[in-house]
Curated annotation (Swiss-Prot):
This is Cytochrome c-type biogenesis protein CcmF. NCBIfam families: nrfE, PRK10369.1. GO terms for biological process: cytochrome complex assembly. The gene is ccmF. One of its GO terms (cellular component) is plasma membrane. Required for the biogenesis of c-type cytochromes. Possible subunit of a heme lyase. Keywords: Cell inner membrane, Cell membrane, Cytochrome c-type biogenesis, Membrane, Transmembrane, Transmembrane helix. GO terms for molecular function: heme binding; heme transmembrane transporter activity. It is found in: Cell inner membrane. The chain crosses the membrane at residues 8-28, 43-63, 94-114, 122-142, 176-196, 211-231, 274-294, 312-332, 352-372, 394-414, 424-444, 448-468, 490-510, 616-636. InterPro entries: CcmF_C (IPR032523), Cyt_c_assembly (IPR002541), Cyt_c_biogenesis (IPR003567), Cyt_c_biogenesis_CcmF (IPR003568). It is a multi-pass membrane protein.
């Protein structure tokens, strides 16, 4: 009965989304206020119907209704309740339902929080989001329905959720990532609405920017959590593998970052209009591309869902319609919104333009590096591999000038400026950067590499120029402490985000260059050394869970003879899925991680273990959190705060 309720709710949501896609847009085109007024109630109805469907799937997992095929494939009577509930989005069908429900959440938020906008603008934006919803609801109903019954079979138990996904990271990572993906549909809808009317001004940028920031914050948090999840769950000691599906989330993040900076120019100066619209289209298109890569079956990845060709063809067709249609509209109407003024050679606008060029260069590198091997293979030309060394080298080249721009850009005035105004502080900061770039790796790790020097230089120049810019802004008209308190949330957000980039670069530079890995065979009581750290293997005890059996190894770590930490690494065997999993143990800190992964028991009663020393690796994720916090502060700046907008 509940499964049928979920099906009926999906069918109702299809009908409502079709009406939302037609009537408000028709009303906006004809100037019919009554039809435009239907946009909000239809959006509320779409949200309600999809919420019922989503709640129904939650209930079916909670009670383990094995008459539903999706429950059979992803749950089991031994699976803990918190993993049962998060298994709702643990596979293809449920994750698609999560996608369209989150799309309804974003639509609901736009309808609720945009009462200050003109009725025509709201009708167009919600109508476009209705069109997007139609495509995905059709996809779920006819190719990926999570409510399909098992009849005439009646299984008494299920196959279990993939053990790799039985982790707290699964509870939060996919919803955060999807909130980011789907959130860019709002920026996309605003962009298409502006193309339809041929009007785009500073007010449009001010309406669109908080929604873009919100999507970017969620996507940043999703990527950060996914990277952390891979680090501790997969047992490889790595945090980013340039996997095609990882790249498919990174590409819209790069486009979204460029869009945020471009929107600031459109809002402040009325420039970059056509380029900003194109970036909004690109960001959401890349989100759709990522969906195609994950669900088409053309990838072999720890992230990819097994899928049949029908699903891949549907998404490809949907991709062509949405991207092709939006680009065709852009080609037809783009000239009507194009900016007529040109930025001066040395101005804040030109700095942000260079920023966008470098971000787009990075995006092209990831795009080509990800898709070229796939296209090459699909064309029958054989397999080629583009691995981490290519991406690492290219990003080192791109990030070096980007870091300098990140520091100098906020110091430059809008419209026109002279470099002589900031020459002295920039020269001093560059001088300090050159010294620190060599000194920091040498004094902290006793050796120097090219990439560690460049990484240290990038970190130092971003941080120094950000602090100098803070001092200049705060003391422009007031004393420092008075001026600091008067700075806007947007300014603090910008500074935190830029410092977050510096922290992440620092963590990457040191963890990539100075990590130490050892594969060892150890018997009880034996020790292995990494630098000044001694890892002593004290034995393995049984460690069984509700749906697995396994062993837990204790490793005592000392530094220069003094106790440092005791780690407990596990090896689990999941009895239903017949899979083995490694649960790494980590002693974390701001300056280093000590990481142990337990392998197999060997014939001579020794155990295989993998030991890691990873300096400053946590700065990668701390920097990501700073970026997200910066975006959040910008989003709630006085100009954009939703509670202020609601009062207008």
């Amino acid at each position: 009965m509940i499964a049928e309720l979920g099906n009926y709710a999906l069918a109702l949501s299809l009908a409502v989304s079709l009406m939302l896609a037609i009537f408000p847009l028709w009303g906006a085109e004809k100037g019919n206020a009554q039809l435009m007024a239907l946009a909000r109630p239809m959006t509320y109805g779409l949200f309600a119907s999809l919420s019922i469907a989503f709640a129904a799937l939650f209930y079916l997992f909670a009670v383990n209704d094995f008459s539903v095929q999706y429950i059979v494939n992803n749950s089991n009577t031994t699976l803990p309740i918190y993993y049962r509930l998060s298994a709702v989005w643990g596979s293809h069908e449920g994750s698609l339902l999560l996608w369209i429900w989150l799309l309804a959440v974003w639509s609901f938020a736009v309808a609720l929080l945009s009462k200050h906008l003109p009725q025509e603008a709201v009708a167009r934006v919600l109508g476009i989001m209705g069109i997007i919803s139609v495509g995905f609801v059709l996809f779920v109903l006819f190719t990926s329905n999570p409510f399909t019954r098992t009849f005439p079979d009646f299984p008494v138990d299920g196959k279990e959720l993939n053990p790799m996904l039985q982790d707290v990271g699964l509870i939060f990572h996919p919803p955060l990532l999807y909130m980011g993906y789907v959130g860019f549909s709002v920026a996309f809808a605003f962009a298409i609405a502006s193309l339809m009317t041929g009007k785009l001004d500073s007010a449009w940028a001010r309406w669109s920017r908080p929604w873009t920031l919100a999507a970017w914050v969620f996507l940043t948090l999703g990527i950060v959590l996914g990277s952390w999840w891979a680090y501790y769950e997969l047992g490889w000691g790595g945090w980013w593998f340039w996997d095609p599906v990882e790249n498919s989330s990174f590409m819209p993040w790069l486009a979204g970052t460029a869009l945020i900076h471009s929107l600031s120019v459109t809002e402040k100066r009325g420039s970059f209009k056509a380029w900003t619209v194109l970036l909004a289209i690109l960001a959401f298109s890349l989100c759709l591309l990522g969906t195609f890569l994950v669900r088409s079956g053309i990838l072999v990845s720890v992230h990819a869902f097994a899928s049949d060709p029908t699903r891949g063809l549907y998404i490809l067709a949907y991709l062509v319609v949405v991207i092709g249609g939006s680009l065709a509209l852009y080609a037809y109407k783009g000239s009507q919104i194009r900016s007529r003024d040109n930025a001066e050679r040395y101005s804040r606008e030109s700095m942000l333009l260079l920023n966008n060029i470098l971000l787009m260069t990075a995006l092209c590198v990831v795009f080509l590096g990800t898709l070229l091997p796939l296209v090459h293979k699909q064309l029958g030309l054989g397999s080629i591999s583009i691995g981490a060394p290519f991406f690492d080298q290219m990003f080192l080249i791109i990030m070096t000038p980007f870091a300098l721009l990140l520091g100098i850009g906020p110091l430059v005035k809008w419209r026109r400026d002279q470099f002589s105004a900031i020459r002295t502080p920039v020269v001093i900061c560059v001088f300090v950067m050159l010294i620190a770039g060599f000194a920091l790796p040498y004094f902290l790790q006793d050796k120097i590499t090219v990439s560690s020097v460049l990484g240290s230089m990038m970190t130092v120049i971003i941080a120094l120029l950000a602090l100098y810019e803070l001092q200049q802004r705060a003391t422009h008209r007031e004393s420092f402490f008075v001026g600091v308190r008067k700075l806007s949330r947007s300014h603090w957000g910008m500074m935190l985000a830029h410092l977050g980039v510096a922290m992440t670069v620092w963590g990457i530079a040191f963890s990539q260059n100075f990590s130490v890995e050892r594969d060892v065979r150890m018997k009880v009581g034996e020790s292995a050394q990494i630098g000044r750290y001694d890892f002593k293997f004290t034995g393995v005890t049984d460690e069984n869970g509700p749906n697995y059996i396994g062993g837990k190894a204790q490793i005592d770590i000392s530094k220069d003879g003094q106790p440092e930490a005791s780690l407990f690494a596990e090896k689990r065997f999941y009895t239903v899925s017949r899979m083995s999993m490694t649960e790494a143990a980590i002693a974390g800190g701001l300056t280093r991680d000590l990481y142990v992964a337990l392998g197999e028991k060997l014939e001579d009663n020794s155990w295989a273990l993998r030991l890691y020393y990873k300096p400053f690796i946590r700065w990668i994720w701390i920097g990501g959190l700073f970026m997200a916090l910066g975006g959040l502060l910008c989003m709630f700046d006085r100009r954009y705060r939703f509670n202020v907008l609601l009062k207008k």
